[in-house]
């Protein structure tokens, strides 16, 4: 049976750096991207933690002779647990002058000499295949032995690289690929890219998008300019021009436009509230949606936005579009907002109109 030791006070984010490109995460960092529940300790096959509200609130260790089975959430016989947690021991049982997978990084490998590991990484977009003993492209689905945060967090998330502040690791189907933001730096607190360096100062709290909490002000002129001839019986609804879900209600050409927004889960388009993916809104598409990911328009359905507090986080904004982050697996290049995942084929259809 597991014994849980509750921790109190501030939690220090400890990073174990073994070589320049290794990516060992503390349990505190793992909890930042993990729902409530138990997680494995990426630095110890015997240890585990408990996450609550994205914080590490407890730690524990299995009895001697047992290892933590993350799939079952129990302390289990070593025969039932596959765990490699320390790259410095990668060469202990390897043949001298040979190459082995870096157990902390899927696109890394180590050269073994006198039981000592010297680790490096494969070229960009490639992973190390421990069976073929060579670097191959991710679409070939190489066997990855890395016991990294991608083994412990939900699928299709981007996490910060603890050894290279401002860079990220994309996690898809348990496999992690290191990357850099084209627009600048990755902010691990916000889960997205930004132009300023988050490593120079404390990262800000996520901003809240327009109309998410506070209503926008009414508009005294919108009904005169765009309202046509509205009446109390036949009001006219006009986009607020700032959000995807907001509108102005006009009941008189001379009266003010009263701001309102669609019911949760809907966006406003051409006078009515509709399913969000049926039109390419050019404002923050996270608004009014209880989603972790939404599609980014004008990217041919190959990019997506990360949402927190109904607001896209840290994404580049350019030419009236949120660019977002790409699906990194070349075998699954298209993002589908309906399923919330990267898929093989484009979701474009007569009703799914984000692929513009």
Swiss-Prot record:
Glycan-bearing residues: 114, 309
PROSITE patterns: CHIT_BIND_II
Signal peptide boundaries: 1-23
GO molecular function: chitin binding
Tissues where the protein occurs: Larval peritrophic membrane.
One Pfam family in the UniProt entry: CBM_14
Gene3D superfamilies: Chitin binding domain (2.170.140.10)
A GO CC term assigned to this protein in UniProt: extracellular region
Keyword terms of this UniProt record: Chitin-binding, Disulfide bond, Glycoprotein, Repeat, Signal
Superkingdom, natural source: Eukaryota
PANTHER family tied to this protein: CHITIN BINDING PERITROPHIN-A (PTHR23301), CHITIN-BINDING TYPE-2 DOMAIN-CONTAINING PROTEIN-RELATED (PTHR23301:SF106)
Record protein name field: Peritrophin-44
Species whose genome carries this gene: Lucilia cuprina (Green bottle fly)
Source taxonomy: Eukaryota, Metazoa, Ecdysozoa, Arthropoda, Hexapoda
């Amino acid at each position: 049976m597991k014994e849980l030791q509750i921790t109190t006070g501030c939690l220090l984010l400890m990073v174990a750096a073994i070589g320049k490109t290794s990516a060992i995460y503390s349990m505190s960092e793992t909890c930042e991207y993990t729902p409530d529940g138990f997680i494995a300790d990426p630095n110890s096959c015997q240890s585990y933690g408990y996450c609550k509200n994205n914080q590490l609130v407890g730690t524990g260790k299995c009895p001697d002779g047992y290892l933590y089975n993350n799939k079952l959430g129990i302390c289990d016989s070593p025969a039932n647990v596959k765990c490699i947690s320390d790259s410095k021991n990668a060469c202990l049982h390897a043949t001298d002058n040979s190459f082995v997978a870096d157990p902390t990084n899927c696109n890394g490998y180590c050269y073994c000499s006198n039981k000592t590991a010297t680790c490096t990484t494969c070229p960009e977009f490639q992973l190390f295949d421990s069976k073929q003993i060579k670097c191959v492209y991710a679409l070939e689905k190489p066997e990855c032995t890395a016991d990294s945060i991608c083994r412990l967090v939900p699928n299709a998330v981007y996490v910060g690289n603890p050894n290279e502040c401002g860079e990220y690791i994309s996690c898809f189907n348990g496999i992690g690929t290191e990357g850099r933001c084209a627009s600048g730096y990755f902010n691990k607190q916000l889960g997205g890219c930004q132009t300023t360096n988050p490593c120079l100062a404390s990262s800000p709290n996520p901003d809240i998008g327009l109309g998410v909490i506070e209503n926008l002000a009414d508009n005294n002129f919108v009904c005169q300019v765009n309202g046509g001839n509205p009446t109390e019986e036949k009001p006219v609804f006009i986009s607020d021009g700032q959000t995807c879900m907001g509108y102005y209600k006009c009941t008189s050409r001379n009266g003010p436009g009263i701001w309102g927004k669609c019911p949760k889960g809907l966006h406003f388009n051409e006078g009515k509230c509709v399913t969000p993916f049926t039109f390419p809104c050019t404002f923050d598409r996270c608004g009014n949606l209880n989603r972790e990911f939404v599609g980014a328009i004008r990217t041919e359905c190959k990019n997506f936005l990360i949402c927190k507090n109904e607001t896209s986080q840290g994404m580049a904004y350019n030419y009236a579009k949120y660019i977002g982050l790409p699906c990194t697996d070349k075998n699954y290049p298209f993002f589908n907002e309906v399923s919330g995942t990267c898929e093989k084929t484009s979701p474009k259809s007569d009703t799914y109109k984000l692929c513009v």
